[in-house]
Amino acid sequence: FPDARERNLEIEYQRNMERYQFLKWGQQSLDNFRAVPPGRGIVHQVNLEWIASVAREENGMWMPDSLVGTDSHTTMINGLGVLGWGVGGIEAEAVMLGQPIYMLLPEVVGFELTGTLRPGVTATDMTLRIVEMLREHGVVSKFVEFHGSGLASLTLPDRATIANMAPEYGATCGFFPVDETTLEYMRLSGRDPEHVENVKRYLSAQGMFYTPDSETPEFTSNLSLDLGDVEPAMAGPKRPQDRVDLSAMKSHWHESLVAPIGHSGHGVDATQTGQQIEVVGSDGETYKLKHGDIVISAITSCTNTSNPSVMLGAGILARNAVQKGLKVAPWSKPSLAPGSRVVTEYYDAAGLTVFLNQLGFHNVGYGCTTCIGNSGPLEPEIEAAIDEGNLIVGSVISGNRNFEGRVHQKVKANYLASPPLVVAYAIAGTLDIDFEQDPIGTDSEGQPVMLGDIWPTDGEIREVMAEAITPEMFNERYSTVMSEPRWDSIPSEASDLYPWAPESTYVRLPSFFEGIQPEPDPISSIEGAHVLLNLGDSVTTDHISPAGAFPHS
C-alpha cells in the first residue's frame, strides 16, 4: 500500500500507547535520558548515524565511547570503532543506574582482510562469506578484530554490515578500529568537525588510531580473507551461515527441496516436486503457485539498509527494471523498511523512489519488520494454496536471520541476500533460477531480459551516491528526530515517582519487591528441580520462543 508507513505508525501508537506514556514520563523525569520517538528508525542505525560519539569528554576527561544494548545486533556500532554488544535487560538496567558491566576477559580472534571486492560483488556478499568462515572457526564468547590492508577499501557502512552480523557468526562483537574512513563517515553524517578532530587527537595520543603502518596486535588465533575471492551469494534456507554461491543457487534449490528435513533440507518426495496449485489473486489475476516461488521479498533490517551502496544499487536496479517493462511476480509481496529517514531522503534525491514504488517496494515504516517476523499476512488465497499443496515457498530478505518460521510461519525456505538481489528475485518470482543462464523476465517488446542487463555498475552507484548523499541531509533529518506530532501529544508530567495506573494491563507495579526487607532472607536449597530444556546444536531462542505474529488458529 502506498500509505503503509503512515497506517503502520498509527497502529503502532494504538497498540503501544501505555509503553510510550511510560517512556515519555522517563524522558521528562530522569536526567541524561532521551527517548527517540517511534517511526524514526532502527536504534542501531540511528546510533550509527547520529548518537554515537566514538570518543567523548566528560568533566575534563576524554574516554572512548562504548555501548551495551538489549538487542543482539547492538554489535553494529563496532563498525564505527565503538566497542559494544548485546546484554540482558537486567544488565542494561543496572548500567543505566550506574553499575558496571562484569565480564570475563575474552579471547580476541584476528581477521585479516586483504585485496578489494571485484566489480558487481556487494558488501552483503562479503559479509555472508565472513559469517561462514567465522562459524567454521568457532568464535562464541570471543571478540573478533578486523585488520589488514583490505580495510582501506571498505566504507564505514560496509564495516557496519559486517559488525551487525556478529551474533550470526557467534562472536560477542566484531570490532573495526577507528581510522580515516571512520572520521570521513563522521563528517558525512553531520558530526561537528571540531569534535571529529578531537576524536582523532585523543585516539592518536592513546595509540588507538589505526593507520596502514599500525603494528598487527597479538591475537589468540588468526584468519584471513582476500576480498577478491568473494563471490555473489545468498545464505539459507534456514541458517545465516549456510552460504550459497549465486551461480549454484538453482542446483542448490533442487537438492534442498528433496533432501531430508534438516538444516538445509525440506524432505519433499521427489514425485511431488512439480506440485502446482492454481490461485486467483485478490486482483483477479490467475497464476499457479509451486515449490520455490518467492512470496516475500523484503528490503529490510539495519544490516543492509544502513549501507547506501547496496540500497542505491537496489534503487538503480529497480529503475533499470521498470524502464525495461519488468514487474514483480504477482505472488511475491515486496516491501521496503529503511533503518532511518535518511534512506528516504537520498532515494528521493536520486529520483529512485518512484521506480521502487512502481515495483511495489513501498516504504512500510522505519523499523524492524520482516526480519523479526513482522512481514504482515500473505494474501489468504496464497496461504490457502500453500496449505493445499504442502508447498515449500520462499522469501528473500536483506536481513540477518532466516531461522525457519521466523520470517513467516508459512514460509519454509528463507534466504538472506543483498538489497539488489531482493529486487531481482522479486521480479523472477522463484528460487528455481540460474541468473547466468535464465532470463529474469521479458521486456515490453517480449524480449528476454538477463539480470546482467539491469544490474548496476559500481561506477553508477558511486556517481549516484556522490550526488545524492550530503552532510546537510543527515543534519536536517536528525535536527527534528526528537519531535513527532503523535509523540509530542502524549500526556505526561514529570514527577519523582512514576504514577502507576492500577487499570493498566501492560505497565504494572511488579509484585516481586513486595515484602522485601533491607536484610534478605537466607538462601534455601533447591530440591526436586528438573531440566526444562536439553537441546542440540543450532537450536536458538527463535525455536524456543518464536518472534512474530500469533496465528489466528
What is each residue range found by the language model?
Residues 105, 140, 219, 290-293, ...:
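A short, polar/charged loop/turn motif at coil->beta-strand junctions and beta-hairpin connectors
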Residues 297, 422-425, 531-533:
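Conserved, well-structured core segments
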Residues 34-39, 45, 52-211, 226, ...:
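Mobile "lid/hinge" segments at catalytic clefts and subdomain interfaces of large enzymes
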Residues 174, 532-535:
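Short hydrophobic-aromatic micro-motifs
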Residues 2-61, 189-191, 197-284, 449-533, ...:
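Flexible inter-domain linker/hinge segments
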Residues 1-113, 125-128, 232-235, 249, ...:
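Long, structured ligand/cofactor-binding scaffold of large enzymes
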Residues 117, 231-233, 252, 302, ...:
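Short loop/turn segments at secondary-structure transitions that flank enzyme active sites
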Residues 122-123, 234-238, 347, 406-409, ...:
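Short conserved micro-motifs at the rims of enzyme active sites and ligand-binding pockets
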